[in-house]
Swiss-Prot record:
GO terms for molecular function: P-type potassium transmembrane transporter activity; potassium ion binding. Belongs to the KdpA family. This is Potassium-transporting ATPase potassium-binding subunit. Keywords: Cell membrane, Ion transport, Membrane, Potassium, Potassium transport, Transmembrane, Transmembrane helix, Transport. It is found in: Cell membrane. The system is composed of three essential subunits: KdpA, KdpB and KdpC. The chain crosses the membrane at residues 1-21, 59-79, 131-151, 174-194, 246-266, 279-299, 323-343, 352-372, 375-395, 412-432, 481-501, 525-545. It comes from Streptomyces griseus subsp. griseus (strain JCM 4626 / CBS 651.72 / NBRC 13350 / KCC S-0626 / ISP 5235). PANTHER family: POTASSIUM-TRANSPORTING ATPASE A CHAIN (PTHR30607), POTASSIUM-TRANSPORTING ATPASE POTASSIUM-BINDING SUBUNIT (PTHR30607:SF2). Part of the high-affinity ATP-driven potassium transport (or Kdp) system, which catalyzes the hydrolysis of ATP coupled with the electrogenic transport of potassium into the cytoplasm. This subunit binds the extracellular potassium ions and delivers the ions to the membrane domain of KdpB through an intramembrane tunnel.
């Protein structure tokens, strides 16, 4: 069997597994967020934090809850790292420097999981399990809560109430993320991932000498790392490490975990909004982009040029032999079209066009299917933009799900789509203009520029993957990427919740013969076109200086 056929079979199996899980998981999440029942453990949590889960919140109160909880999470994780040397289970590692601690705290709370440190050489068991892994659950639950608040904005009328942030946070964690993660961890242990709290071992090597190996609660952290589209690895090699991702079966399962909730949330959206066809339209747009990018990546990396590529069966530099080009390409596209950022190969070693695909996947806004929660609300923002453009073409006031898209709503949507490009291009320009940041580039020319562009694209889009040629463990990059991660995560949430509040206050508009049907394939095509055109106009000049120039030169 050729590698290409094997890759096609892997992709087919993945699509089948996602299709089987789509309906039951999507409906289950809709029931979770619509339920008025509170389980006893949830009541204990509400009592501990002093929250009333039955109290409805308008968007400013919902936003205050998101920001206050996230700010406390950043502070807690920062302090935990700063005192690591005094904590039990630190494995002898010292406390983390202030700029590194800030960067890591911002990274994990913002669901980015950018790592400019070596996990197995810097973080002990307590920080890994009690700090980083906990934030993997909580940051994902925050994203899901904001997405559900926007869905309620479409579903509700003549009210400004969007639900209760604390109830959404707890339910998303306790009823969705924890149960699936437990199952996922068991599967990964069965596949060969490690799960223990052992210390550092001296292991002999075949070529002579010794090597230090860490134990750790890897399988449990790996499960939520992928399920919550977090991406931060227990080891520096991330999912290329055999302790995290031992074989092709575990590799495909991890990709399944990455895509599971983002795709299923479109079913949740359709169910809560009262029209499953609307969810299918969003799903269709996501699926077209994801499958298209995956096919393009596999074609790019399998393309042979010269005897070395023919012998290797494609561009194998930076890829694990146990995954091959197909397994690496499927993983790379899934991790950059979502906010995961986990890697099982090194994106910096991909072909020029292959690296450009990973960059473009993030620059789309990670909406196909995007991060847990953030993918859905990002796609719904683009859906509003597409409806607005269609309305301009036919001279009608645009509507979406029975809600008028007026000046106020378009301003919120426009601010949302401008924030991330401004952060990415602004920080990249400053870093290239100053002498010190450029010293961190391992490569010069187009690839060196791509390293800088990739770093800020990854940070501002809350992805967390990197072109490994960049030395990001400097005060400049730790600070500026940390700021980009926080602003790129929470500023868009401000406009999402403000938009949700404005929609919830409206009275539904009855559908007429002139209303644009947003539950048809034609609209899905319009949505895909809108996304690609806006992204192209925004980022093409930067991409032309980096991956496109490198790809054409090679």
């Amino acid at each position: 069997m050729s590698s290409q056929v094997a890759g096609l079979l892997q992709l087919t199996a993945l699509i089948a597994a996602l299709a089987l899980a789509y309906r039951p998981l999507g409906d289950y999440m809709a029931r979770v967020y619509s339920s008025e029942k509170h389980y006893r453990p949830e009541k204990w949590m509400y009592k501990a934090i002093g929250a009333n889960p039955a109290a409805e919140m308008r968007w400013p109160a919902y936003l205050r809850g998101v920001l206050a909880f996230s700010a406390m999470s950043v502070l807690f994780l920062y302090l935990m790292q700063r005192v690591q040397g005094s904590l039990p289970g630190s494995l002898g590692f010292s406390s983390i420097d202030p700029d590194q601690a800030f960067n890591t705290a911002a990274s994990f709370v913002a669901n980015t999981n950018w790592q400019s440190y070596y996990g197995e050489q810097a973080m002990g068991h307590v920080v890994q399990t009690g700090g980083l892994a906990v934030q993997n659950f909580l940051s994902a639950a925050v994203g899901m809560a904001v997405a559900v608040a926007l869905v309620r904005g479409f579903a509700r009328s003549r009210t400004g109430e969007l639900g209760n942030f604390w109830a959404d946070l707890v339910r998303g964690t306790v009823r969705i993320l924890v149960p699936i993660s437990v199952i996922g961890a068991i599967v990964l242990v069965a596949a060969g991932a490690i799960q223990n709290f052992s210390g550092i071992h001296q292991v002999g090597q075949f070529a002579g000498g010794t090597q230090e190996w860490n134990g750790g609660a890897v399988a449990s952290q790996e499960a939520i790392k992928e399920l919550g589209t977090n991406g931060g690895g227990y080891f520096n090699a991330n999912s290329a490490h055999p302790f995290e991702n031992p074989n092709p079966l575990s590799n495909l399962f991890e990709v399944f975990l990455i895509l599971l909730i983002p795709f299923a949330l479109t079913r949740t959206f359709g169910r809560m909004a009262g029209s499953l066809k609307q969810g299918y339209a969003i799903l269709g747009a996501m699926a077209v982009i994801w499958i298209g990018f995956t096919a393009l990546m596999m074609w790019t990396e399998f393309a042979h040029r010269g005897p070395a590529f023919e012998i290797a069966g494609g561009a194998m530099e930076g890829k694990e032999a146990r995954f091959g080009i197909a397994g690496s390409s499927i993983f790379a596209v899934a991790t950059t079209l979502t906010s995961t950022g986990a890697v099982n190969s090194f994106h910096s070693s991909y072909t020029g066009f292959g690296g450009g695909i990973t960059l473009l996947g993030m620059q789309l806004g990670e909406i196909a299917p995007g991060g847990v929660g953030s993918g859905l609300y990002g796609m719904l923002i683009m859906a509003i933009i597409a409806v607005f453009i269609a309305g301009l073409m036919v001279g009608r006031t645009p509507e979406y799900l029975g809600k008028k898209i007026g000046t106020r709503q378009i301003k919120f949507a426009a601010c949302y789509i401008l924030i991330t490009p401004a952060l990415v291009l602004g920080f990249t320009a400053v870093a290239m203009a100053l002498p010190t940041p450029a010293d961190s580039m391992t490569n010069s020319g187009a690839h060196g520029f791509s390293e800088i562009l990739y770093a800020y694209t990854s940070g501002a889009n809350n992805n967390g993957s990197a072109f490994a040629g960049l030395n990001a463990d400097t005060q400049w990059f730790n600070t500026t990427i940390g700021i980009a991660m926080l602003l790129g995560r929470f500023l868009p949430m401000v406009f999402v919740l403000a938009l949700a509040g404005s929609l919830a206050e409206q009275q539904p508009v009855p559908e007429t013969a002139g209303t644009l049907r947003t539950d048809k394939p034609l609209y899905s095509g319009l949505l895909v076109g809108t996304i690609l055109i806006i992204t192209g106009l925004t980022y093409f000049p930067a991409l032309a200086l980096g991956p496109l120039a490198e790809g054409l030169a090679s």
